[in-house]
Amino acid sequence: MKKLVVGALTVSTLLLNNVSATETLKDIHLTGISSTAADIDASEIGIGYGVSVYLDNSIFWGVSFDFSGGTLDNSQIKIENKTSTKNDNSLYNAGGDFKLGYALFNNKLALYGIGSAFYQGIGGIDGAGLGYGAGVDYRITDNIALNVEYKTYSMTSNYGDYDYDRISTGIKYTFK
C-alpha cells in the first residue's frame, strides 16, 4: 500500500509539473435527486457549494459540500433483519465530494470521477459512509452550468449496513 501511494504521488508530481490553473470557479448549486436508501425509493432536493479548478493541461478537479432532504416512499425501514418502529419517512443528508477528471471544449464540458464522504438521517436512523461515482458538468454560459451525477455509498448505521444510491441533476451558478 505504501509503495502504491508513493508511486501515485510521484506520477502526479511529474504530470502536474509546471501546470497552472487556467480557471478557478466557485459555485452554488441546486439539485433534484432520485435515490434508493436501504432498498426504499426516495425523492430529494439539495443545495451546495463547490470550487472547481481547471488546469492548463485540461485536468479538472474540485470539491463540493452538499445538503439535501426529502421523503422516503415507505416509512418501514428494514436493515439487516431489523425493522425501524419509528413512523418517520424523512431523509436528510450532508456530504463532501472530491472530483477529478478531464475538461473538454475550452472547459465547457467536464467528465469526472467522484470520491465522497456522507452522513445521513433516514427515518430516524443515523448512518455514515464512503462512496464513489461519476459526473458530467456542461457550462451553457460563463455563469450557468448543468450537471448530472451518479453516486453509490456503503452506509453504516446503528441498525446495520445498507446501500444508498443516488442520481442527481442540477443547475449551478458559477462565479470567480
Task: Give residue ranges: language-model regions.
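Cleavable N-terminal export/targeting peptides
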Residues: 1-25
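Short glycine/proline- and aromatic-enriched beta-strand/turn motifs that initiate or cap beta-hairpins
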Residues: 19-59, 67, 119, 174-176
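Membrane-embedded beta-strand positions of outer-membrane beta-barrel proteins
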Residues: 26-32, 63-65, 96-98, 111-115, ...
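Flexible, solvent-exposed loop segments that connect beta-strands
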Residues: 34-40, 68-92, 117-128, 154-165
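Hydrophobic, lipid-facing positions within transmembrane beta-strands of outer-membrane proteins
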Residues: 43-49, 92-98, 130-134, 165-169
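Residue-level signature of outer-membrane beta-barrel architecture
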Residues: 51-53, 67, 98-104, 138, ...
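Repeated loop/turn-to-beta-strand initiation elements of outer-membrane beta-barrel proteins
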Residues: 56-61, 106-111, 138, 142-148, ...
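Outer-membrane beta-barrel "beta-signal"
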Residues: 138, 163-176
